[in-house]
Design a protein with these regions (language model features):
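Conserved beta-strand hairpin/beta-sheet module of binuclear metal-dependent hydrolase folds
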Residues: 1-46, 129-144, 162
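Active-site metal-binding loops of divalent metal-dependent hydrolases
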Residues: 11-12, 32-34, 61, 121-124, ...
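Active-site neighborhood of phospho(di)ester-bond hydrolases with catalytic His/Asp-centered motifs
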Residues: 30-33, 53-61, 81-84, 141-144, ...
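Active-site metal-binding motif and surrounding structural segment of the metallo-beta-lactamase
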Residues: 36-82
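Active-site environment of divalent metal-dependent phosphoester hydrolases
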Residues: 62-66, 87-90, 125-126, 148-151, ...
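Metal-dependent catalytic neighborhoods of phosphoester/phosphodiester hydrolases
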Residues: 67-76, 89-93, 224-231
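Metallo-beta-lactamase
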Residues: 83-130, 134-137
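Cap/insert and terminal regions of metallo-dependent hydrolase folds
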Residues: 151-248
């Protein structure tokens, strides 16, 4: 999507999360959950020049979203944007670069010709946020780590031209997995991760006549099945009267 408002997903899952937001006046990196070298490689594979990134937007301080932030930001001389609690939390793990800008949920700001609005999500990391991006009379919404879709998230994510939403696990596969019971309970909690059913049940409310594309993200390699999710998504989307016709698990 180089040259127009859009998003290129570099990777999404427990091993790392990152995406490039293309704006009218530049590009932003959303999360930096891979090493700096891996981020650069993934960008170059998609014909994105890493030197064109003008800032890094962080959703929360878990390593799979932030571990490459310091090296990439310092190497390319760009700031990281994150909330004050996340800054404090991530600084302890030495994930942050020299240049940092504090942002606040509910307070929109302008970058690269994009109106960026962070909003709070219910997740078990300190001060987790999602984002909406507005430009060219379109809205992109991203929410990839949340235990449930609360009223605020539903309000912010409704009517996106492109929606990137978590579909982390299939509950039956999670329960059969060898994961510790404490981890299973955390994932299933209201501050854990969305299941396939959780995500798909929300689409009737979130997708409107303005919705063009959906990306189902943060799939568990161990506790989800891409073919199953694809089938579930296609069946759900046939019921909806919107322009959306594509589901792409990552």
């Amino acid at each position: 999507m180089t040259g127009k408002f859009g998003i290129t997903v570099l990777g999404s899952g427990s091993k790392g999360n990152a995406a490039v937001i293309h704006g009218p006046e530049g590009k932003l990196l959303l999360d930096a959950g891979f090493s700096a070298r891996e981020l650069e490689n993934r960008m170059e594979q998609r014909e994105i020049d890493p030197d064109n990134i003008q800032g890094i937007l962080i959703t929360h301080g878990h390593a799979d979203h932030i571990k490459g932030c310091r090296t990439f930001a310092d190497r390319h001389h760009v700031p990281a944007y994150l909330t004050a609690p996340t800054l404090k939390d991530a600084d302890r793990n030495h994930f942050l670069p020299e240049r940092k800008t504090v942002i606040a949920p509910g307070s929109a700001f302008e970058l690269c010709g994009i109106t960026v609005e962070p909003f709070t999500l219910p997740h078990d990391a300190v001060d987790t946020i999602g984002y909406t991006f507005r430009a060219e009379q379109k809205k992109i919404g991203v929410a990839t780590d949340l235990g449930h879709l609360n009223m605020l998230a539903r309000q912010k994510l409704r009517g996106c031209a492109l929606l990137m939403l978590e579909a982390n696990h299939e509950p039956s596969l999670l329960q059969m997995s060898p994961r510790p019971i404490q981890l299973k309970r955390r994932i299933l909690s209201r501050h854990g991760h969305l299941s396939n059913e959780d995500s798909l049940a929300a689409l009737e409310e979130l997708l409107t006549e303005d919705s063009v594309s959906l990306v189902l993200a943060h799939l568990s390699e161990e506790c989800n099945n891409r073919d199953l999710l694809e089938d579930m998504a296609e069946k759900t989307l046939k019921k909806l009267s919107c322009t959306f016709r594509h589901a792409r698990p990552l």
